[in-house]
Regions:
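Glycan-recognition and catalytic cores of secretory/periplasmic carbohydrate-active enzymes
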Residues: 1-229
Length: 229
């Protein structure tokens, strides 16, 4: 995890979000909470102030209390944020990986969560279901396979514990190998997430290919006025 840039701006934005009760003192939402935990850990690393690590740990405890389920973690606290998204869970696994640098129990929690969600979400040889029912009893109506979910899981699993999650990693790698050659991402968030993931294992074939392809797509999407189309 690299140090933050422009700390003053980050702190101003974080203070504003607190004042507006957006985050971390707003309603729980797993995607935002995962990124926020990583941000707080980065602030702790950069500024060496214990309050940021303490707040990250508080967010983790709140997520468990509010969104935690017998298997997995609900999408969000609002009534319409039911079900479970695999890519949200994968980002949460990454946040637990980051916190495991300070307390090994978070690696154990991450491994346990990965094992709990893997089988319900993953259809070997086909893909990773994008959204599941809240109890993981089956796919959420109207949802199929996610385009990047196998990549999400592969990266998060490997960062957490390659030995403990070896069978799950192998299944994700097989899915990646089957789809990476044909996958073309044209959506801005997807491009950003793919480029972020390629940094962790940059020499692997899928990472080399997708980094080149994603950067090329960004060049084609860039408009002279300074916007993406």
């Amino acid at each position: 995890m690299r140090g933050l840039k422009d700390i003053d701006t980050v702190l101003r934005k974080l203070a504003w979000m607190r004042e507006e009760r957006i985050w971390p003192n707003g309603l729980r939402y797993l995607w935002t909470d995962a990124f926020g935990v990583v941000l707080l850990a980065s602030l702790y690393d950069t500024l060496k102030e214990q309050k940021y690590l303490d707040e990250a740990l508080w967010v983790v405890a709140e997520v468990k209390t509010v969104l935690g389920r017998k298997r997995g973690i609900r999408i969000g606290e609002e009534p319409d944020r039911d079900g479970q998204y695999f890519h949200y869970l994968s980002m949460w696994l990454y946040a637990l990986h980051v916190l495991s640098r300070y307390d090994a129990k978070f690696k154990d929690e991450g491994v346990a969560l990965a094992r709990a969600i893997h089988e319900p979400f993953v259809v070997p040889g086909r893909g990773v279901i994008w959204k599941m029912q809240e109890d993981l009893s089956g796919p959420y109506p109207g949802y199929g396979f996610g385009a990047l979910d196998a990549f999400d899981g592969y990266v998060s699993y490997r960062l957490l514990d390659q030995a403990a999650l070896a069978p799950q990693i192998a299944e994700m790698k097989a899915l990646i190998d089957a789809m990476a050659g044909e996958l073309v991402i044209t959506q801005d968030l997807g491009l950003g997430m793919m480029l972020w993931m390629t940094q962790f294992f940059p020499q692997e074939d899928w990472a080399v290919l997708q980094r080149q392809r994603s950067l090329g797509m960004l060049d084609r999407m860039w408009m002279a006025e300074g916007y993406f189309a």
